[in-house]
Regions:
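Non-catalytic alpha-helical scaffolds and adjoining flexible linkers that form interface surfaces
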Residues: 1, 5-223
Length: 223
């Protein structure tokens, strides 16, 4: 049984009969982290894989335990937001550039992870409000509050509990992640201090709006 994210029908369950056999033409397509063109036959509750043309294996991911764990988390997080019957071209493109960035290894894995989280949640309409105050729409931003939905101006921030002052770097970083062309999403680096700030904001926001434990995240935390 395979789970495939498609641009036309969203996340679908597919059975690849005989894929485990060494001589099966579907064997390569049944591996993890494979992208390509899949021909499926629809059934009552699932699909049957008939043919597959693999275009990308991301073969570098299984060779590195840390990359493998991050890639697994990316797929699990994507699975949480996707379902069958949806047009998922933005999600599929984001997944591709993210796995490619992890495989290439030129950008910090942790930065890729959090940029992916922020961008996907924004695509799904659950993103951090990062351009104006989430309460009054002022453009002068100073605080972050997860339960409020994002960034706040000084006046609104002082009225709420559990707010945290944010830097101009953090504000720009969030805006860049949400608006950058996907081909340039991972074309930046952050200082250690800025990375810690992004991590805090992304973690608090995810915890506030996603009530699910990710198994791959538990493994990542143990590395």
């Amino acid at each position: 049984r395979l789970v495939i994210l498609t641009k036309e029908r969203g996340k679908i369950t597919v059975f690849a009969n005989g894929a485990r056999k060494a001589v099966s033409q579907l064997r390569a397509a049944s591996q993890s982290f494979v992208m390509g063109t899949f021909t499926v036959f629809p059934g009552r509750d699932s699909y049957t894989l008939v043919k597959a043309e693999v275009r990308e294996y991301f073969s570098g991911l299984p060779l590195d335990m840390e990359k493998l764990c991050y890639a697994s988390y990316v797929c699990e997080f994507m699975s949480y937001y996707t379902r069958e019957g949806c047009y998922c071209v933005n999600e599929l493109n984001l997944l591709y550039v993210t796995l490619k960035a992890l495989e290439q290894g030129t950008v910090d894995n942790q930065l890729i992870r959090y940029a992916f989280e922020v961008r996907l949640m924004d695509i799904e309409g659950q993103g951090i409000h990062a351009y104006t105050c989430v309460r009054c729409n002022k453009k002068e931003l100073k605080y972050f509050n997860a339960k409020a939905g994002g960034l706040l101006c000084e006046a609104c921030g002082k009225e709420l509990k559990l707010t945290r002052t944010v830097s101009e770097t953090l504000i720009y970083t969030l805006q860049y992640i949400q608006s950058a062309d996907l081909t340039k999403l991972y074309a930046f680096q952050l200082s250690e201090e800025a990375m810690a700030e992004l991590k805090y904001v992304a973690d608090r926001f995810r915890e506030a709006y996603i009530d699910r434990e990710f198994k791959s995240l538990e493994i990542l935390s143990s590395l």
